[in-house]
């Protein structure tokens, strides 16, 4: 995958002290923008991407040649209207779309970092992306938002910078990664590390790729993004291009073929070590523990207005976990709205064309900006 094509990036020379104790300097942050920053510089929206996302939220991704991961929501006349708002999205540090990550060259060794790369956290990701405000000379964002891991970054941003966003929209997320989700992430990591081509994380320097392990990790994770009813309705027990069972271990069922396909295409656009590092960052995320068991304290200094959105069939970050955020905000008298969207598409609902979600998101943003 050639990531040197049409990538915008800034080199941040301000030292960043990571939660692991290391300090990084002169690191790259890849980003993309949509729309125009107005004269008052009050129409900027910072979008945080999820685990396997990147900075290309809309239009055509110049690397993969596919539509951006949130093209349903971001664009001219869409819920996040780029005719009105200036949208910024950066590839997180630890990622593999041009930002400082394990596939970058370590200047001290002239080799790719691999697993010598420092372990990073959601907090580190957010602190790195905060530099974008200075780069664009933006004093205060109109909004910060994101789904899944993007929602975690949204919460962390408000915690870290309580006066730097007027509106925050965390979608389908949590304030503390659950044991179940840590378990799923560990399954993926072990799949990668069990691949003989992983080479203790040094595979890139040896011209190898742990594609089998990464593919299985993606297959396992992808199941958690869907729902039981959605899977049953779409696939059921339908056979894959055959009239009867073959009594072997080929893909008899359509769902098997679908998962294998998802795994195979994923390895073409994602780095295995980045998968390890980013899932670890998600597992370490715990705003509740950070505030000694009182989530409300994460937001007590902010006047940011919140809209929390969850989905009925999301069992990865269920409505109950989203409501915990609402309860914490209510406890400090924050201005918070909450919407649970009916959908059978599971956790991935926020990435798909779910009209009620897109309408809710667009209406809220439009109303909030009119009061800006």
UniProtKB/Swiss-Prot annotation:
Amino acids binding substrate: 218, 348
A biological-process GO annotation: homoserine metabolic process
Keywords from the UniProt entry: Acyltransferase, Amino-acid biosynthesis, Cytoplasm, Methionine biosynthesis, Transferase
Catalysis performed (reactions): L-homoserine + acetyl-CoA = O-acetyl-L-homoserine + CoA
Molecular function via GO: homoserine O-acetyltransferase activity
GO CC terms: cytoplasm
Signal peptide: none
EC number: 2.3.1.31
Record has Cytoplasm as a keyword: yes
UniProt-annotated location(s): Cytoplasm
Main location: cytoplasm
Active site (UniProt): 148, 314, 347
Any matching Pfam family: Abhydrolase_1
Pathway(s) per entry: Amino-acid biosynthesis; L-methionine biosynthesis via de novo pathway; O-acetyl-L-homoserine from L-homoserine: step 1/1
Assembly and oligomerization: Homodimer.
Function according to Swiss-Prot or TrEMBL: Transfers an acetyl group from acetyl-CoA to L-homoserine, forming acetyl-L-homoserine.
HAMAP family in the record: MetX_acyltransf (MF_00296)
NCBIfam families, A to Z: homoserO_Ac_trn, PRK00175.1
PANTHER family, sorted: HOMOSERINE O-ACETYLTRANSFERASE
Record's protein name: Homoserine O-acetyltransferase
Organism: Pelagibacter ubique (strain HTCC1062)
Gene: metXA
């Amino acid at each position: 995958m050639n990531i040197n094509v049409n990538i915008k990036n800034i080199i941040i020379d301000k030292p960043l002290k990571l939660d692991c104790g290391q300090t990084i300097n002169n690191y790259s942050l890849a980003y993309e923008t949509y729309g125009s920053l107005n004269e008052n510089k009050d129409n900027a929206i910072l979008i945080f991407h999820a685990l396997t996302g990147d900075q290309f939220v809309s239009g055509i991704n110049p690397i993969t040649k596919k539509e951006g991961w949130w093209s349903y929501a971001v664009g001219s006349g869409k819920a996040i209207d780029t005719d009105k708002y200036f949208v910024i999205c950066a590839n997180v540090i630890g990622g593999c779309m041009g930002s400082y990550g394990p596939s970058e060259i370590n200047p001290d060794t002239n080799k790719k970092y691999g697993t010598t790369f420092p372990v990073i956290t959601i907090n580190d990701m957010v602190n790195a992306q905060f530099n974008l405000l200075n780069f664009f000379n933006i004093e205060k964002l109109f909004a910060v938002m994101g789904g899944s891991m993007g929602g975690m970054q949204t919460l962390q941003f408000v915690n870290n910078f309580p006066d730097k966003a007027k509106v925050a929209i965390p979608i389908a997320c949590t304030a503390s990664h659950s044991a179940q989700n840590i378990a799923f992430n560990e399954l993926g990591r072990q799949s990668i590390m069990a691949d003989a081509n992983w080479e203790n994380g040094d595979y890139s320097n040896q011209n190898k790729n742990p594609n089998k392990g990464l593919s299985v990790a993606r297959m396992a994770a992808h199941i958690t993004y869907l729902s039981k009813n959605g899977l049953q309705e779409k696939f059921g027990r339908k056979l894959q291009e055959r009239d009867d069972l073959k009594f072997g271990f080929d893909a008899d069922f359509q769902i098997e073929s679908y998962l294998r396909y998802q795994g195979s295409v994923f390895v073409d656009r994602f780095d295995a070590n980045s998968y390890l590092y980013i899932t670890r960052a998600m597992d370490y995320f715990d705003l509740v523990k950070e505030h000694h068991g009182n989530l409300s304290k994460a937001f007590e200094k902010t006047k940011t207005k919140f809209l929390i959105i969850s989905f009925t069939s999301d069992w990865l970050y269920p409505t109950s976990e989203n409501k915990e955020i609402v309860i914490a905000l209510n406890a400090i008298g924050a201005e918070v709205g909450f919407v649970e969207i009916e959908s059978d598409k599971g956790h991935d609902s926020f990435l798909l064309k779910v009209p009620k979600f897109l309408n809710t998101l667009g209406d809220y943003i439009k109303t909030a900006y009119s009061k800006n």
